[in-house]
Amino acid sequence: MGNILRCFKGDDDGGDHYPYYKPTSRPHYQPPHYHGQPAAPPAPPQQQPLGPHGVTPSTVGVAALAHDLLNFESTSMVPDGLSQHVVSSRKAQVKWYQKLLEAYKNTTPPPKTPADAAQLIARALNMIQRADLEITSNYVSPQGILEFYNFPIPSLPSASSNYQPSSLPEGVQFVLNTLPVYDKCIGDGDGFTAYVSTTDPRESANVPLEVHELVIARTQARKCRDYQSADALLSSLDEAGYKIISCSDDEVLARKYRIRMRGIDAPELKMPYGRESRNALVKLIGGKSVKIYVYDLDQFGRYVGDIYCNNLFIQEQMLKNGHAWHFKTYDKRPEFARWEREAKAANRGLWASGNPEKPWDWRRDQRNARQDAIQVY
């Protein structure tokens, strides 16, 4: 998880890697004593209330979270004392820490204050029961994961910011749950190529017979060490819209989907801010699995949809940070217009240039220029 977690790990000598932190006990600090000097007087009694980690909010609450995430990454175990403070099962807690670990890794710089850490937890876990997140008037106990770490209760994100629909919105045809998106498969700020495993129920029933035969033939070729034929069969799979992807020392057959993000239009790569827009999308979804609510198939054979990743609505992030335009011609959602106005008012991203060229105007001019060149020829 980077240097911030390693700094809490200590020496690899087989001892306690985090000697001053115990989830179910309170720490004891021994002041340093140097030879020839009088011992330091006893420390005054701790006046601030101690939380379940035995620390105050202003000391090592953030370090405790970092330690727990490091421990979870190594052992898949959640803190022992957490069950005393939340109502959900241990299985649910494991899912929380998976989300927290991913959110922590993707946060730069990592949280340094209790308030920052509380915001990270709230963003990553905004879909869990509120009673598990904080103290409420209806729940005196359990106290919640924020209280477990002595963190303040932040303002929870609004539903429009980090909400994935629990039922299919009107117009959605189906949902895709992708494998992690390769950075190189992100073409610009509003489109990318994604792969969905054929173990997905929706996909498994629709794999063509010819694809099954190609996979079997490739497996046989590899057994015979005929790697030239195996590579040729991979090319045939790609032409059929499928790909064999290596995942955790295993191979997965996946279907290829070309995706167009609904309701936004990002600068083309050759336009000013084009590469910055693409890089912003890479940071949001690169190397991560995404959920795609598919509405339609466009004239170029791309699946048009809403994109969610780590509970973030990706179009919202692109619009709010000035990485894309609201494509009003094809999407009238008022929140899209509002997010674009917010970015424009704050001069974020592409709006910093004052009057950026619209990508649809740029494409029209490019088409006209090509047409003029053909007529001259």
UniProtKB/Swiss-Prot annotation:
Annotated region described as Disordered, given as residue ranges: 15-57
SUPFAM superfamilies, per the entry: Staphylococcal nuclease
GO cellular component annotations of the record: plasma membrane
Family of the protein in this entry: Belongs to the thermonuclease family.
Documented EC number(s): 3.1.31.-
Name of protein: Probable staphylococcal-like nuclease CAN3
Domain TNase-like: 177-353
Positions of N-myristoyl glycine lipidation: G2
Known role: Enzyme that catalyzes the hydrolysis of both DNA and RNA at the 5' position of the phosphodiester bond.
The organism's place on the tree of life at top rank: Eukaryota
Cofactor: Ca(2+)
Cofactor: how and how many bound: Binds 1 Ca(2+) ion per subunit.
PROSITE patterns linked: TNASE_3
Membrane topology: Lipid-anchor
Molecular function GO labels: endonuclease activity; metal ion binding
Lipid attachment, kind S-palmitoyl cysteine: C7
Binding residue positions for Ca(2+): D190, D265
Xref: PANTHER family: EBNA2 BINDING PROTEIN P100, STAPHYLOCOCCAL-LIKE NUCLEASE CAN3-RELATED
Keyword Lipoprotein: yes
Start-end of Low complexity biased regions: 27-38
Keywords, in A-Z order: Calcium, Cell membrane, Endonuclease, Hydrolase, Lipoprotein, Membrane, Metal-binding, Myristate, Nuclease, Palmitate
Location in or out of the cell: Cell membrane
InterPro entries in the record: SNase_OB-fold_sf, Staphylococal_nuclease_OB-fold
Active-site residues, record numbering mapped to chain: R260, E268, R302
